[in-house]
Amino acid sequence: YNLSTMWQSPNGTIRAILDGTVFRAPILVKGIEPYVKNWEKPITLARHAYGDVYKASEMTIPGAGKCELVFTAEDGTVTKELIHEFKGPGIVQGMHNLEASITNFAHCCFKYAIDTKQDVWFSSKDTISKKYDHTFKDIFQDIYDAEYKETFEKLGITYFYTLIDDAVARVVKSKGGFIWACKNYDGDVMSDMVATAFGSLAMMTSVLVSPDGNYEYEAAHGTVQRHY
């Protein structure tokens, strides 16, 4: 296409600007049956729309050397964290997220659950990612306890956190009918799995809801022609 550079994903760029949450849900029709026979109700994927690998910086390591994370505060204070002592060529990736964006993500999920009267599951890998993923977990729990727990209990719906691998096993055994909140990459992958398991990757809605009330409707995938 004679591009001047390898531009980033247009959808990813728009999502990063709007922030918010991408809600993806299978479209159920007679004649298209779920491959997972016990699924009776739609499973809605709530995908965080900002950060992680989609806003990452990457580097090819040419040879031996030391790679560090360096944070320079406004007052000039420098904090360093060793990533790896390379003995030869390799690769490295640095990604980030924002507490404000994670907070918006949590609010979107809980409000959508109240509107639709569905349970919320949130999953990540905090046993391995003690700071990154654990921050997501803590923010979700704090917001739920402070602002939504009472309303959830009145409506008879629940929120719980579990590890991403445990969530996958639970989802397959479930009857559906809940919101599965995931980080950006997890939501990207698992939404395609859920839609396909419901019968067709092509039969999936995708709506980005931003914190300030804007909506973006998009195709939920880029390779659907391979799946007809």
Residue ranges, per PLM feature:
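Glycine-rich phosphate/nucleotide-binding loop
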Residues: 171-228
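Glycine-rich oxoanion-binding loops at beta->alpha junctions
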Residues: 22-24, 162-171, 225
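N-terminal glycine-rich phosphate/adenylate-binding segment common to multiple enzyme folds
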Residues: 1-78, 185-189
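Glycine-rich phosphate/diphosphate-binding loop of Rossmann-like nucleotide-binding domains
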Residues: 71-75, 79-164
